From Swiss-Prot:
It is an enzyme of class 1 (oxidoreductase). Homotetramer. It catalyses: myo-inositol + NAD(+) = scyllo-inosose + NADH + H(+). PANTHER family: BINDING ROSSMANN FOLD OXIDOREDUCTASE, PUTATIVE (AFU_ORTHOLOGUE AFUA_2G10240)-RELATED, NAD(P)-BINDING ROSSMANN-FOLD SUPERFAMILY PROTEIN-RELATED. It holds the Pfam family GFO_IDH_MocA_C. Keywords: NAD, Oxidoreductase. The gene is iolG2. GO terms for biological process: inositol catabolic process. The keyword rRNA-binding does not apply. SUPFAM superfamilies: Glyceraldehyde-3-phosphate dehydrogenase-like, C-terminal domain, NAD(P)-binding Rossmann-fold domains. Coiled coil: none annotated. This is Inositol 2-dehydrogenase 2.
C-alpha cells in the first residue's frame, strides 16, 4: 500500500511536491491537497485527490498517512504542531519557523513525542543535504581528500527578490540554506557570524539591503563567506568552494544548458532554484517516503537542525542590526 500524502500549500513548492509525489516518487499517493485558494489547490492536485481550504481538515483526515507542509513560512510551526497532535508524520519545508520562539516550541513538542514514542514525527526540508553535488563535496571534505578545510566561499544569487522581502527575511528564508549546510558540510557548528551590506542595488524594495555579505566561523576555525544577492536579474546561481591545505573543491553548475549555434557558445542559466535542485527535492522526498514505508527514521534534517539554523539566523540578524558586529551564536 502506498503512503497516502496530504500536501498543504499548492504554490510553487507545493505544486512541485505534488507533481513529484504523483509521478516520480515510488510508494506514494497524493490523496488530499489544502490551499487557501481552492482553485489553485484543484489545479495542482491529481484528479483523485480531495481538495480543501482548511489544512486542519487535511491533517485530521483518515485519508492521510503523512503530511507535507509547503505553505507560507508563517504557518509552518502551527501546522507542524497540529500534525504532532494528530500523531501524523510531517515533512515541513524550511524554515522550521520564522521566529526563534516558535522554533523552540516545535522542538520542545518534538522532544516530548520522542520521549513518549522513541521516534520523531518531523522531517525538515533542507534539501541541499540530498543534492548530489553537496553530498560529493561533503564526502571530499570529511574524507580530508585535500587535507584540512581552511575557508569556504559561497554565492547565492536570485533573479529577483520576492515581494515584501526584507533584510531579515533574506536571512531566514534564503541564507538559511547556507546556515544549515555549512555545519553539515564541515561537521562543525557555527560559533560566530557577521553581516555587511554591499552597495545597494536600485532594484531592492524598501527594507531590503541587497546584496549582502555574511561570514560564519565554525568551531573548527574554518571561515565561510556568503554573498547573497536576491536581485541579480540574470537568473539563479549557487556556488560553494572549499579551500583546503592541498587544493580546492567546488560545486559544478550542473543545471546549466549549453548551446552552440552560429559560431557562439552559450550557457542558459535557470530563472530560479528549482531546476538546479530538482534532483535534491526528488531524492529527499523518496528518502522520506521509503523510510515511512519501512518503519524507519527518515534521514532528513530534523527539529534540532531547524533550531540550530534558527539560532544562527538570529545571531546574523543581531549582527545586521549592530552595524555588522561579529556576533556569537548561543546554543544554550
Amino acid at each position: 500500500m502506498p503512503i497516502r500524502v496530504g500536501v498543504i500549500g499548492a504554490g510553487v513548492m507545493g505544486a512541485d511536491h505534488i507533481r513529484n509525489l504523483s509521478t516520480t516518487i515510488g510508494g506514494a499517493k497524493v490523496t488530499f491537497v489544502a490551499d487557501l485558494d481552492a482553485g489553485r489547490a484543484a489545479a495542482a492536485a491529481p484528479p483523485s485527490a480531495r481538495i480543501t481550504t482548511d489544512p486542519t481538515e487535511l491533517i485530521n483526515s483518515s485519508d492521510v498517512d503523512a503530511v507535507v507542509v509547503a505553505s507560507h513560512d508563517s504557518t509552518h510551526a502551527g501546522l507542524v504542531l497540529e500534525c504532532f497532535e494528530a500523531m501524523t508524520p510531517v515533512l515541513c519545508e524550511k524554515p522550521l519557523a520564522p521566529t526563534l520562539l516558535e522554533s523552540l516550541e516545535v522542538v520542545a513538542a518534538d522532544a516530548d513525542i520522542v520521549a513518549a514514542t522513541g521516534a520523531s514525527l518531523l522531517s525538515l526540508g533542507f534539501m541541499r543535504r540530498f543534492d548530489p553535488g553537496y553530498v560529493a563535496l561533503r564526502q571530499a571534505v570529511q574524507g580530508r581528500v585535500q587535507g584540512e578545510p581552511l575557508m569556504v566561499h559561497c554565492v547565492s544569487r536570485n533573479a529577483a527578490a520576492g515581494p515584501g522581502t526584507t533584510s531579515e527575511l533574506a536571512i531566514t528564508n534564503s541564507a538559511i540554506h547556507e546556515l544549515d549546510i555549512i555545519p553539515w558540510l564541515l561537521g562543525s557548528p557555527v560559533t560566530e557570524v557577521s553581516w555587511q551590506a554591499g552597495k545597494q542595488t536600485s532594484r531592492a524594495e524598501p527594507g531590503l539591503q541587497d546584496p549582502s555579505f555574511m561570514t560564519l566561523r565554525t568551531a573548527d576555525g574554518t571561515l565561510t563567506t556568503l554573498e547573497l544577492y536576491l536581485n541579480a536579474q540574470y537568473g539563479y546561481t549557487t556556488r560553494c568552494e572549499v579551500v583546503s591545505e592541498q587544493g580546492t573543491t567546488s560545486l559544478q553548475e550542473s543545471s546549466l544548458l549549453g548551446i552552440e549555434q552560429d559560431g557562439t557558445r552559450q550557457a542558459v542559466i535557470p530563472a530560479d532554484w528549482r531546476p538546479r535542485f530538482a534532483d535534491a527535492y526528488r531524492l529527499q522526498l523518496q528518502a522520506w517516503i521509503s523510510a515511512l514505508a519501512g518503519g524507519e527514521a527518515p534521514s532528513l534534517a530534523g527539529a534540532q537542525d531547524g533550531l540550530n539554523a534558527s539560532l544562527v539566523a538570529q545571531a546574523m540578524i543581531q549582527s545586521l542590526h549592530s552595524d555588522g558586529t561579529t556576533t556569537k551564536v548561543s546554543y544554550s
